Regions:
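Helix-to-loop junction immediately C-terminal to a conserved catalytic motif
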Residues: 51
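ABC ATPase NBD coupling module
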Residues: 68-85
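Short coil-to-helix segment of the ABC ATPase nucleotide-binding domain corresponding to the Q-loop/switch region
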Residues: 97-105
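Conserved ABC nucleotide-binding domain
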Residues: 124-138
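Conserved ABC ATPase signature
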Residues: 136-146
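Conserved catalytic motifs of ABC-family nucleotide-binding domains
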Residues: 157
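Catalytic Walker B motif of ABC-type/P-loop ATPase nucleotide-binding domains
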Residues: 161-164
Length: 229
């Protein structure tokens, strides 16, 4: 089976405050895995490294057969736009833009044909239950905004979706519905899913649970580092 993700001997230093070492991590295409661990253990750092939002100090990170480490920022941006979907706790949607425009921007970043942007965005949003595609996302409910964020993550049919604490701000009912949506969307898109969460109840949803403690991480008490959660 071909791999969606491969990490080998990856090491990341955040100054003198924090370090993370991943000797090996592989995720197959279509596989769904949970990164589990407490706050500050390095779950978010791992996802940011894979996405190219942080640069590893050493080691190799390969997404869909393309190396993310050691490439230019523009090359990393291209690989991310084409192969990686992102769903974070904070959606980073453009509030004054419509749902359709927010999703279309992902297609534009991936270099998809411009004349297909609107129709592809609208079709996927409708499929995910968003009918008001021309309304600014600031006027949508939290649950609807989550659906827009998921649509943006999968519209380019990525190889892998990275979800960083995607339900942390939701109550139990909405959290369950959000994860149902994310996992179903990934299945239909044929995308692998790597989700980071401190919620142990999430483990039953995944065929594979990876404890971040199985990696080597160190942090000094009283320090803080960008994406460590």
């Amino acid at each position: 089976m071909s791999h969606a993700l491969q990490l080998a001997n990856v090491h990341f230093d955040y100054g003198e405050d924090f370090s993370l070492t991943i000797t090996e991590l592989t995720l197959n295409k279509g596989e769904m895995a949970l990164i589990s661990g407490g706050s500050g253990s390095g779950k978010s750092t791992l996802l940011w490294l894979i996405a190219g939002l942080l640069r590893a100090t050493s080691g190799s990170i390969t997404v869909a057969g393309e190396r993310m480490d050691g490439v230019s920022e523009s090359a990393a941006d291209r690989i991310r736009a084409r192969h990686i979907g992102l769903v974070f706790q904070t959606h980073h949607l453009l509030p004054e833009f419509s749902a359709q425009d927010n999703v279309s921007l992902a297609l534009m970043a991936a270099g998809e044909p411009e004349n297909t942007h609107a129709s592809r965005a609208r079709e996927l949003l409708n499929k995910l239950g968003i009918e008001r595609v021309h309304v600014p996302v600031a006027n949508l409910s939290v649950g609807q905004q989550q659906r827009v964020a998921v649509a943006r993550a999968i519209v380019c049919k990525p190889t892998i979706v990275l979800a960083d604490e995607p339900t942390a701000s939701l109550d139990q009912v909405n959290a369950s519905q959000a994860m149902d949506l994310i996992q179903q969307a990934c299945r239909e898109a044929g995308a692998a899913l790597l989700c980071a969460s401190h919620d142990r109840a999430m483990q039953s949803r995944f065929e594979r649970v990876i404890q971040v403690d199985s990696f080597v991480s160190t942090a000094r008490a009283g320090t803080k580092s960008g994406a460590r959660a």
